[in-house]
Swiss-Prot record:
This is AdoMet-dependent rRNA methyltransferase SPB1. Residues 367-414, 796-835 form a coiled coil. Keywords: Coiled coil, Methyltransferase, Nucleus, Ribosome biogenesis, rRNA processing, S-adenosyl-L-methionine, Transferase. It comes from Mycosarcoma maydis (Corn smut fungus). One of its GO terms (biological process) is maturation of LSU-rRNA from tricistronic rRNA transcript (SSU-rRNA, 5.8S rRNA, LSU-rRNA). The gene is SPB1. Residues 491-522, 814-823, 880-892 have a biased composition (Basic and acidic residues). GO terms for cellular component: nucleolus; preribosome, large subunit precursor. It is an enzyme of class 2 (transferase). Pfam families: DUF3381, FtsJ, Spb1_C. Its EC number is 2.1.1.-. Residues 868-879 have a biased composition (Basic residues). Residues 523-542, 555-568, 635-684, 697-708 have a biased composition (Acidic residues). The keyword Repressor does not apply. Residues 448-476, 491-604, 635-713, 814-835, 866-921 are annotated as: Disordered.
């Protein structure tokens, strides 16, 4: 068989880069051109903003997205839509339109592009000269768009076709960029005339002449006739036109710059040495052209010899005239000055006198008188010009400010100017000497409370008396600020409880008096006093509120100053009263609801919130209040119990999640010890003697027993779940530590830290994060990992069920075969040999039924297998040779059988009979 020919179309485009692009997922083979350019010049890794012009289908965008840093801005533009590419922004627009520029400005905002890449080409197919000019024009248009968005020092990469306009483009590139280099990557086909120009270091000029980027001026062809006229006017002979001497200015002022002669010599000019008579040099007009065109100034004529006798013609001038090609700038200037002096000496040029200069300066000019209309027109023109000048000046000033602002934003030097704007003047507490007053937050909360409920006269008097305290006393102000901070923190917790179920469940546990932290062993008298104080307080106060009330009661005051005691007493009463009022508003009773149902009283303060919103808010606050664990023991009817169960479902879920996430360390200690309960201070409360401190039955902590039993059951079912628990268990088992040692470790200096006078938010933060770290061992981590590996090695539920079903079916088949074997064995009509053979067949059939029947392998009879006799190469087991004809016939046979309603089988199948050979009717 002949070898399969590789597909080759479009001059071999299906090369290795084509297959590499398909393997790596690039949309075009042109992506490797940018990859190789970036490998050589390394411009993508340092860029943060990139613009791809003529980007379809998106190969260069994929490369830019791959090599540029993360969070870079990449924008692609093309006439046709581009399929989305990760980390890029694309849109379809013409790069010559103003709409394209506006859309780019909207996307870039204040950014400037670090790199602009262009790999576009126009529609070709006409004359080659026209296609080359269209490509050069497209490149110049992309450059015009690039200079608008490029930052200083940016890079511009473009594709250029080799043509006569290539040098003009390079000249423009060199004027705008510091470094311009043309290269042809290996991925570019050799038959293609494309080359790539990498322009680095954009100069960012202040202004660019529009003609500089206009194709009509950049690619303009010079007329040879006009060049000849210019050379004749300059005094350059035709014999020197086209030579290096023709560029006289370059030869005079840049003598080191060598210009090669690429156009040959003039007709009839067989020498390279040209001499100029001195008198012709003196009388000529184009001095620079003559100095750059000729090699020597001779004094051979009679008129020229007279010049040698002049005093200005010294030996230095004669030496300079002998060879003009070796002179420098200073020598050429000396020759030009010598020419001026000789022209004055010969009378060709007349010197200007002082009287002539004065006459020229004082020359009078007759001014015609202007009529009234002309004066009005001149005045209007002057005013318009002045207004235009002022407008230009203002526009220039705004542009400068805008440029400075953009520069600051690019350098990240901006300062947010709206700091403090959200605080109103009435909240700044003007007149009390402080710039920021925390009392403003309390005033806002009080205003909201006034809108929700009418405050009684005695309450308002208490609030006013608490506000008008002596601000001059720093201690009083500090205590007042602490009280205000606590009030704001309580308001924050209330709002957080409305939003977050986890936070609400956590606060419910903290409010529970049973979860109060241990503060040491006290005497019976102190305990009795604490019990009396607890009975006097609100029943809703839990362990955390007890801490707050104890902190307020244990404050030390100045007993010498009676006024301070009075102020502090009023302040405490105001704080307690405000807390009580908040609880009353948060937990509306039946009386309060009845009061709300009555017509509202007339007041000077009117709420802007509707009654529906107020009722919804009160219902939310009521639901939060009844979520307290104290209400869970109340007897409810069936409907109320069902509603309470639905409301508390979220809280229970949140409590379980938080307990699993945050209290792993505490659970580990309790899991190891069994009956040991580890709190934030990590030690166990040791019970006292039963005779001295007997606990009544009604005060026994049943919830604690349930919690411990639940922990023990969880440990028994699932084992230890944390590394700390495993480490402590290993230490106990290996006799490295005893239970008494663990109890002793629970007593530390942290258990008796004085927390009086500390703010509530600080105590909450300490309770959450201030915990003792339990050391873990490498063996504990290894044990947990081994356990996790064992759990991971177990099959999933579906696989296990499938294996169980397969095993069950096998057992059923064996059981069925065993019953048949017993029946055969009980039959006395057959011999033992026949019984044995029949039983063996039954067992083999039952086992064979469990095995999967091998499918017949189909081999297509084409290619190397066409006309093959014997087993095809590479096939094992049963096989069947098929061909397209057989496939079509089988499909037709099935279709016909389905139409006739027949079942496929050997009885229905009939042999094929050629047409014309069947039986005649």
């Amino acid at each position: 068989m002949g070898k399969k020919q590789e597909k080759k179309t479009a001059k071999g485009r299906l090369d290795k880069f084509y297959w590499l692009a398909k393997e790596q997922g690039y949309r075009s083979r042109a992506a490797f051109k940018l990859v190789q350019l970036n490998k050589k010049f390394n411009f993508l890794e340092k860029a943060r903003c990139c613009i791809d012009l003529c980007a379809a289908p998106g190969g260069w965008l994929q490369v830019a997205s791959k090599f540029m840093p993360a969070n870079s801005l990449i924008v692609g533009v093309d006439l046709v839509p581009i399929k989305p590419i990760p980390r890029t922004i694309t849109f379809a627009e013409d790069i010559n339109s103003y709409k394209c520029r506006d859309q780019l400005r909207q996307i870039l905002k204040d950014w400037k592009a670090d790199i602009v890449i262009h790999d576009g080409a126009p529609n070709v197919g006409t004359a080659w000269v026209q296609d080359a000019y269209a490509q050069s024009e497209l490149t110049l248009q992309s450059l015009r768009l690039a200079v608008e968005f490029l930052t200083a020092g940016g890079t511009f990469v473009t594709k250029v076709f080799r043509s006569k306009d290539y040098n003009n483009l390079l000249w423009v590139f060199n004027q705008l960029f510091k470094k311009v280099e043309a290269t042809k990557p290996s991925s570019s086909r050799n038959v293609s005339a494309e080359i790539f120009v990498v322009c680095q270091g954009y100069k960012n000029p202040a202004r660019i002449d529009p003609k500089f980027l206009d194709p009509r001026h950049v690619f303009k062809e010079l007329d040879p006739a006009s060049l000849a006229d210019q050379d004749q006017e300059a005094g350059v002979p035709l014999s020197l036109k086209g030579t290096s001497a023709g560029n006289a200015h370059a030869n005079v002022f840049e003598p080191k710059k060598i210009r090669r002669n690429r156009e040959g010599y003039a007709d009839g000019d067989y020498t390279l040495f040209h001499s100029l008579d001195a008198m012709d040099f003196i009388k000529g007009q184009d001095v620079i052209g003559m100095l750059g065109s000729y090699n020597q100034i001779s004094f051979e004529s009679d008129e020229s010899k007279k010049l040698l006798s002049l005093p200005d013609t010294n030996d230095e001038m004669r030496e300079n005239c002998s060879d003009l090609k070796v002179l420098g700038k200073k020598d050429f200037r000396n020759l030009m000055n010598w020419r001026k002096e000789v022209r004055l000496a010969l009378g060709i040029d007349l010197p200007k006198s002082k009287h002539q200069d004065l006459a020229e300066q004082t020359q009078t000019v007759e001014v015609e008188e202007m009529d009234e209309d002309d004066q009005i027109d001149d005045e209007l023109a002057r005013l318009n010009e002045e207004a235009a000048r002022k407008a230009r000046k203002e526009r220039r000033r705004k542009n400068e400010l805008r440029q400075k602002k953009i520069l600051k934003m690019q350098l990240q030097m901006t300062t947010p100017m709206d700091i403090g704007m959200d605080v109103m003047d009435d909240q700044l507490g003007a007149g009390n000497g402080d710039m920021f007053e925390i009392s403003s937050g309390e005033r806002v909360s009080k205003k909201a409370l006034i809108q929700q409920a009418d405050v009684s006269d005695d309450e308002s008097e208490t609030i006013v008396s608490s506000q008008h305290t002596d601000d001059d006393d720093p201690e009083t102000r500090a205590r007042r600020l602490d009280a205000e901070m606590d009030a704001l923190y309580d308001e924050f917790k209330q709002k957080q409880s409305e939003r977050d179920a986890k936070f609400r469940a956590k606060q419910a546990r903290l409010q529970d008096a049973k979860n109060d932290s241990w503060h040491g062993i006290k005497d019976d008298e102190e305990n009795d006093e604490d019990d009396d104080e607890a009975n006097l307080s609100d029943e809703s106060e839990g362990g955390y509120d007890l801490v707050q009330r104890r902190k307020e009661q244990e404050e030390t005051f100045d007993t010498d100053d009676e006024e301070d005691e009075e102020d502090e007493r009023l302040e405490r009463e105001a704080t307690q009263h405000s807390k009580k009022r908040k609880r009353d508003l948060a937990a509306p009773t039946a009386d309060s609801f009845e009061m709300d149902a009555k017509p509202p009283k007339r007041s000077l303060v009117h709420s802007l919130v509707s009654d529906a919103d107020v009722s919804a808010q009160q219902s939310r606050e009521a639901s939060i209040w009844f979520d307290n664990p104290l209400f869970k023991d109340l007897e409810l009817d069936e409907q109320d119990a069902q509603e309470a169960l639905e409301d508390d479902q979220d809280d229970e879920d949140a409590w379980e999640e938080e307990q699993d996430d945050e209290d792993d360390a505490e659970e580990s200690d309790s899991e190891v010890e069994g009956e040991q309960e580890v709190e934030d201070d990590d030690f166990e409360v040791v019970p006292q003697d039963q005779e001295e401190h007997a606990i009544p039955d009604e005060e026994w902590d049943l919830n604690g027993e349930d919690e411990e039993a639940g922990k023990q059951k969880r440990i028994k079912d699932h084992g230890l779940a944390t590394a700390e628990a495993v480490a402590l268990a290993q230490a106990l088992v290996n006799r490295q530590i005893t239970k008494e040692d663990l109890m002793d470790q629970g007593f530390s200096k942290h258990n008796f830290v004085d927390k009086d006078g500390l703010p509530t938010w600080f105590l909450d933060d300490e309770q959450k994060h201030y915990k003792a770290n339990i050391p873990i061992t490498k063996e504990a981590i290894q044990a947990l990992r081994e356990r996790q590996r064992a759990l991971d090695a177990r099959p999933i539920k579906k696989v296990a069920e499938a294996k169980a079903r397969k095993k069950m079916r096998t057992l059923r088949r064996l059981e069925k075969a065993q019953k048949k074997a017993e029946t055969i064995n009980e039959n006395e009509d057959i011999s033992e040999k026949e019984k044995s053979n029949t039983i063996n067949k039954l067992l083999a059939k039952s086992v064979k039924g469990a095995q999967k029947k091998k499918e017949v392998q189909l081999v297509v009879a084409k290619g190397v297998n066409r006309g093959l006799k014997g087993r095809p190469k590479g096939t094992k087991g049963r096989y069947k040779m098929v061909d397209p004809r057989m496939k079509k016939e089988l499909r037709a046979f099935k279709r016909k059988a389905k139409r006739d309603g027949k079942k496929l089988g050997s009885s229905n199948s009939k042999p094929r009979v050629p047409k014309g050979y069947g039986p005649r009717n």
